Amino acid sequence: MVAPMYGSPGGRLARAVTRALALALVLALLVGLFLSGLTGAIPTPRGQRGRGMPVPPASRCRSLLLDPETGQLRLVDGRHPDAVAWANLTNAIRETGWAFLELHTNGRFNDSLQAYAAGVVEAAVSEELIYMYWMNTVVNYCGPFEYEVGYCERLKNFLEANLEWMQKEMELNNGSAYWHQVRLTLLQLKGLEDSYEGSVAFPTGKFTVKPLGFLLLQISGDLEDLEVALNKTKTNHAMGSGSCSALIKLLPGQRDLLVAHNTWHSYQYMLRIMKKYWFQFREGPQAESTRAPGNKVIFSSYPGTIFSCDDFYILGSGLVTLETTIGNKNPALWKYVQPTGCVLEWMRNVVANRLALDGDSWADIFKRFNSGTYNNQWMIVDYKAFVPGGPSPGRRVLTVLEQIPGMVVVADRTSELYQKTYWASYNIPSFESVFNASGLPALVARYGPWFSYDGSPRAQIFRRNHSLVHDLDSMMRLMRYNDFLHDPLSLCKACTPKPNGENAISARSDLNPANGSYPFQALHQRSHGGIDVKVTSTALAKALRLLAVSGPTWDQLPPFQWSTSPFSGMLHMGQPDLRKFSPIEVSWD
């Protein structure tokens, strides 16, 4: 076929289309430049500018020093004994699927300076990973080409109002341990942001963080609910989508108590860091206040994220805390999501982890200022109350908390754990009042037992297979389990084909056929599944250690490989192409 000349009718049409496309591109670029300030777009790391894709070093250690005469803060290489804080990053992502970050602060300095310094040194050692993670996950959030003006303005206004309300509460309650920890958390985030931008200066008065800057990395869980509450037209959350599996297993004879968690997430998020924070914070702002019990914490996390987000924590207080998301399907409850009177979930879990000594105190701290966002079932395991080989203490070993907008329900589940020998969590509320209030009965009526607490696929698999767990290795196998092509409990009767990769302890939704027929979004083909497992035991938790594996399960299935997957075009900077890693033991000297 001969291409039409511009003078012909077809040529004039081609020329008009070309001009329109060029104009659209220019406008898109201008809009992108205009909106970059609103979205908090981040620059390439300073040392990598002009060199293409940033390349993180195999290891890096940096310290933040305070000049006693000038009061100036200065970043230096290496670990210095007089530093306000130091951090070391070992990048083994290509070898194990994990980078490892160790961060210490110095108790000779006040809490506020320690917190700010913690953020500074973390960004200083992980800036390349932060850049790549941002590009993979949130660069277009409220940004060019995917911008919803109304929603993004509402989100920005909500976050600004919430930050302002918290600032007032910190001023009004300047002797409160709770608000002291909130302030330290925000200072740590401020230090992270300042350090990445190359403008380190401790804020001596009021300070703020950018509502659509690095705060976006902290509120990824809260955003799932804020999007709905603030009427975002297009949300990324698939109806029915699972978000983590967890199992607490009492071994025969009560000889050990194992705690395990696997995170379900979009595969773009598989740039992982295992973190160790050793803070020297006091509980409250007073000089005579004692050290916070949760200053030592090990957790699975992500670049630029100062909490777990999975969530899974091993704490120096003897607690292990973890959650799976239960969400909210009842539109009438979104009225409880307000910018004032609430602290977003990510920050409440940081404060509870740092201040609590047991499950009761953890729940009391966490349920204050319920935001109604990132609605989860939390499990608080207190290893101090567990006696290996002993009878049930009756209470304190396991506390379960469930949150939805306007409601938090808490109960001690120790007796049930000892009676059944396991507690499983799989994104469905266990409390009847929460289940009913969250709108799930309507989904059960429409779609059947897939949405029910006892009848969902994972509920049935855990009930059938928990007795196979007798040590750490068998716990790891169960938490990686996905034999959806052969397991009758993985069948979806309303699907074509019936076997479904979502219906397993560790999902592999990428393996569902793109041309299949499915009753709701969670069962479709998606770049989504279980992306890790973390397991600890009585002895490991006491030593702040764990077993961990990174990447989608490949025990019964082929390993995930970006280049051969249907999602090869998705941005996944810094990630290995083939995810075929074995479990490792995570420990620090």
UniProtKB/Swiss-Prot annotation:
Question: Oligomeric state and partners?
Answer: Interacts with IGF2R.
Family to which the UniProt record says this protein belongs? Belongs to the phospholipase B-like family.
> Listed disulfide bonds for this chain?
142-152, 492-495
Q: Where is this chain primarily localised? A: other
Enumerate the InterPro entries for this protein.
PLipase_B-like, PLipase_B-like_dom1, PLipase_B-like_dom2, PLipase_B-like_dom3
Coiled-coil region: none
Q: What does this protein do?
A: Putative phospholipase.
Q: Which one Pfam family would you cite for this protein?
A: Phospholip_B
Signal peptide interval: 1-41
Q: Name one GO cellular component term.
A: extracellular region
A Gene Ontology annotation in the biological process aspect, one of them, is: phospholipid catabolic process
Per the UniProt entry, the glycosylated residues are 88, 110, 174, 231, 436, 465, 515
Task: State its Enzyme Commission number(s).
Answer: 3.1.1.-
Q: Which GO terms describe its molecular function?
A: phospholipase activity
Q: What name does UniProt use for this protein?
A: Putative phospholipase B-like 2
Kindly state which keywords UniProt assigns to this record, in alphabetical order.
Answer: Disulfide bond, Glycoprotein, Hydrolase, Lipid degradation, Lipid metabolism, Lysosome, Signal
- Please name the gene that encodes this protein: PLBD2
Places the protein is found: Lysosome lumen
Q: How is it modified after translation?
A: Glycosylated; contains mannose 6-phosphate sugars.
Origin species, per record, is Bos taurus
